[in-house]
Amino acid sequence: INSKELAITHLFAVPAPLQFMMQHPEFNSTDFSRLINVGVGGAPCAEIIIKTWQSKGIDVIQGWGMTETSPAGIFLAAEDSLNKIGSAGKAVLHTEIKIVNKNMKAVELNEIGELLIKGPNVTPGYWNNEKATKESFHEGWLKTGDLAKFDSDGFVFIVDREKDMYITGGENVYPAEVENILYQLDEIAELAIIGIP
């Protein structure tokens, strides 16, 4: 990164290595001036990671996708990285997304539901597995298993995996939200929140 001749200009990573780099003793003294942007995806990214890299003057570009979406489905453009921290962005070209409740009805703005996606980049089904295909699709829409919400500008915020949510005290608790809060503590290097019955 410090080499004038060989310095990288673009970096893509899942959140963990970005966090590990932040914890390196030389992180604060490293010259990141040639690094234009950091792309992050593959797992929920704690806001502290986004804010820390952005404080270095680096655009953090987030995205969401899965193998079934070849792989991109949602993308947050660099110009939105500061004003939409925590968002995965908007649907990629020729792709449609919606967020629905358990009855497959569209949810209101800022209401959490399951993210559905369809488009030419989305698989038509699972090879030789009609059961999995039937369970994973609803009227041509892929049911992702991810919980998300739209803000008033149409940006998608991934909340967590549906199977990771747990209920305590009558409240829905999303591990990623708890992790985002705990990551703000200097004493926390790495953590994972798991609901135990």
PLM feature segments, named:
Residues 94-96, 139, 144-145, 189:
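Short loop/turn microsegments at loop-to-beta-strand junctions
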Residues 11-14, 103, 119, 124-125, ...:
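AMP-binding/adenylate-forming catalytic core of the ANL superfamily
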Residues 100-101, 109, 144, 150:
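Hydrophobic alpha-helical segments, especially N-terminal targeting/anchoring helices
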Residues 42, 65, 89, 146, ...:
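Active-site glycine-centered loops adjacent to acidic/histidine catalytic or metal-binding residues
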Residues 74, 90-94, 105-136, 171-173:
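Conserved ATP/PPi-binding loop(s) of AMP-dependent carboxylate-activating enzymes
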Residues 17-18, 45, 122:
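Alpha-helix capping/helix-boundary segments
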Residues 3, 8-13, 22-83, 96:
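Gly/Ser/Thr-rich phosphate-binding loop
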Residues 2, 24-25, 129, 169, ...:
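Residue-level signal for well-ordered alpha-helical positions
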